[in-house]
């Protein structure tokens, strides 16, 4: 009886402790859980993301609950009369004041001048521009890893793009279009910002946009014009939120986004962006694990999602992406901007619905050309579906359609890419042979809308460009990855001063000059003729050392420390070979 009475008396005390210490206990529990999860995975390969059964998930919830009870108990005891806080209240108060002082000093030291969110364009009167009655919808419908040489609209012997062939006469087709990054992350970043990846330092994950680059992008300008922005791509690698693009999209990959946020968060973001991103990233990791353990949503391995092809869940496949796009076309406020990226042609095995150039969909080897062509045919078929839907809705001639790819097959940078733009009412048609690049697309769209592209964009409007030629800079990642997609293992060796930047190439007058800037022992400068020289180019090709100097100058202008790339130093210490 006495035991029962004691237990009953303890209940109010436990409730009181819970009310008093719940918040710090939750913070400590979340921190301890993340540390334990990372530790157990590093040592034993066991972590919460692999909990696929109810029993396994319950095991983790028990651990979390025990952590929470433990911290409640320890906090209550420490705060009791004979606890640590009770005994050493004065000393602890002094210690707390010292720690607060040090924290304040840290905040002052890490303080940045508030980031500017100005976009450098005047959008107030654009909707009333005399160029057109109303702003058009804009759809970027891209596919991963497509060489233009495998598309019949570019002269390929197989009819891989029958739909695009049929609208060639009402489109503007660019014959010498180049990527700015061999990685999708950097290429999509270049597409949406009009900035070189060397400027934003966004080449491959874990790179994210930082500083004013977080706010300076095409979607932000379009939102200022009243566009509703839609991002249908891939989480982790090219999702706008995951890349820390701010004020960019209203909808991204199955979720509505709150671009306003709290004023307090915005205040800290502009002044302590690194701290805010650190808190956001850890909060996201904790949320993903808890959502997975609760069965609300499964943690999806981003690398496995890319490579699983036909095995992808419907909502994570290209079928799901096209379904999302159709739903948004029907439901989204007008005008809208949609950035869509399909993965069917990514490889090394390809995803598509119908075997056109093969007997079956069975792929016994990697990078099989016939199946690659099937995937390109599928992209063309999806493009037809969107075109027809817009036509049925009466929106076709009020929509700017851009068909493009992020990089060449197998992440190659020495292949031209498709760029096909279908303007409303067929305003611009024909074929352009002048070289163009991914960073040119954003300023081209703005020029069409009547907006002068901001100075921070590296690209040029293709609508107002003459016959001049200029160097195109292309990057690859330095990551030497050891990856097991099923076990979430990725190892990367990132070193200063170039970090995720590996090889940099310069396409100039039909020649691609390339060098691995991290090979400090013997940097290799190679050159390759990649397309015929334009008539406006000089008769004599660049000398290798001049090309080398142009690449180094570009890196220096982009803010890199190029001391170890000094041409004279290289000539003295190493050999620079031209192949």
Stretches found by the model and what they are:
Residues 148, 163, 374-426, 442-452, ...:
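Metal-dependent active-site segment of extracytoplasmic phospho-/sulfohydrolases and closely related
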Residues 130-136, 147-264:
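His/Cys-centered metal/cofactor-coordination and adjacent catalytic loops
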Residues 89-95, 103-134, 316-336, 356-399, ...:
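A long, amphipathic alpha-helix that forms part
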Residues 134-138, 170-175, 223-230, 332-338, ...:
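Loop/turn elements at helix/coil->beta-strand transitions in domains of secreted/extracellular proteins
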Residues 1-26, 30-45, 49, 57, ...:
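Membrane-interface soluble catalytic domains
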């Amino acid at each position: 009886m006495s035991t029962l009475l004691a237990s009953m008396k303890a209940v109010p005390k436990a409730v009181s402790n819970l009310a008093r210490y719940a918040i710090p206990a939750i913070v400590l529990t979340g921190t301890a859980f993340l540390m334990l999860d990372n530790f157990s995975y590093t040592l034993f390969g066991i972590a919460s993301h692999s909990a696929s059964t109810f029993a396994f998930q319950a095991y983790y919830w028990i651990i979390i609950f025990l952590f929470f009870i433990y911290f409640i108990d320890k906090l209550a005891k420490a705060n009791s009369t004979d606890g640590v806080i009770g005994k050493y209240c004065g000393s602890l108060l002094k210690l707390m004041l010292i720690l607060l002082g040090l924290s304040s000093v840290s905040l002052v030291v890490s303080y940045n001048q508030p980031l500017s969110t100005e976009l450098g364009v005047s959008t107030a009167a654009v909707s009333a521009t005399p160029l057109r009655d109303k702003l058009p919808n804009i759809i970027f419908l891209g596919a991963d890893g497509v060489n233009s040489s495998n598309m019949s609209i570019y002269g390929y012997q197989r009819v891989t793009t029958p739909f695009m062939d049929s609208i060639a006469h009402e489109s503007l087709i660019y014959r010498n279009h180049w990527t700015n990054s061999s990685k999708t992350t950097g290429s999509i970043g270049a597409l949406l910002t009009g900035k070189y990846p060397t400027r934003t330092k966004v080449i491959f994950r874990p790179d994210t946009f930082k500083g004013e680059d977080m706010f300076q992008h095409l979607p932000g300008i379009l939102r200022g014009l009243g566009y509703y922005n839609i991002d249908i791509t891939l989480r982790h690698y090219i999702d706008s939120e995951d890349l820390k693009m701010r004020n960019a999209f209203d909808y991204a990959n199955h979720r509505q986004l709150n671009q306003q946020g709290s004023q307090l968060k915005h205040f800290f973001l502009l002044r302590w962006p690194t701290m805010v991103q650190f808190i956001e990233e850890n909060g996201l990791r904790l949320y993903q694990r808890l959502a997975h353990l609760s069965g609300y949503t499964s943690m999806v391995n981003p690398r496995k999602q890319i490579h699983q092809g036909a095995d992808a869940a419907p909502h994570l496949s290209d079928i799901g992406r096209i379904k999302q796009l159709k739903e948004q076309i029907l439901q989204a406020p007008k005008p809208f901007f949609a950035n869509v990226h399909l993965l069917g042609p990514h490889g090394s095995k390809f995803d598509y619905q119908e075997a056109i150039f093969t007997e079956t969909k069975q792929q016994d080897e990697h990078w099989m050309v016939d199946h690659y062509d099937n995937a390109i045919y599928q992209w063309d078929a999806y493009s037809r579906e969107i075109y027809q839907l817009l036509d049925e809705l009466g929106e076709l001639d009020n929509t700017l359609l851009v068909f493009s790819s992020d990089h060449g097959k197998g992440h190659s940078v020495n292949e031209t890419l498709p760029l096909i733009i279908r303007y409303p009412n067929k305003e611009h048609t024909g074929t352009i042979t002048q070289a163009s690049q991914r960073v040119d697309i954003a300023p081209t769209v703005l020029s069409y809308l009547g907006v002068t592209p901001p100075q921070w964009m590296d690209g040029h409007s293709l609508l107002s460009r003459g016959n001049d030629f200029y160097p195109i800079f292309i990057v690859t990642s330095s990551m030497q990855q050891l990856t097991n997609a099923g076990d979430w293992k990725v190892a990367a060796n990132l070193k200063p001063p170039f970090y995720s930047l590996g090889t940099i190439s310069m396409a100039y007058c039909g020649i691609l000059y390339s060098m691995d800037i991290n090979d400090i022992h013997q940097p290799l400068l190679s050159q390759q003729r990649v397309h015929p020289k334009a008539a406006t180019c000089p008769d004599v090709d660049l000398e290798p050392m001049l090309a080398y100097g142009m690449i180094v100058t570009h890196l220096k202008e982009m803010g890199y420390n190029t001391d170890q790339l000094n041409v004279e130093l290289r000539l003295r210490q190493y050999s620079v070979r031209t192949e």
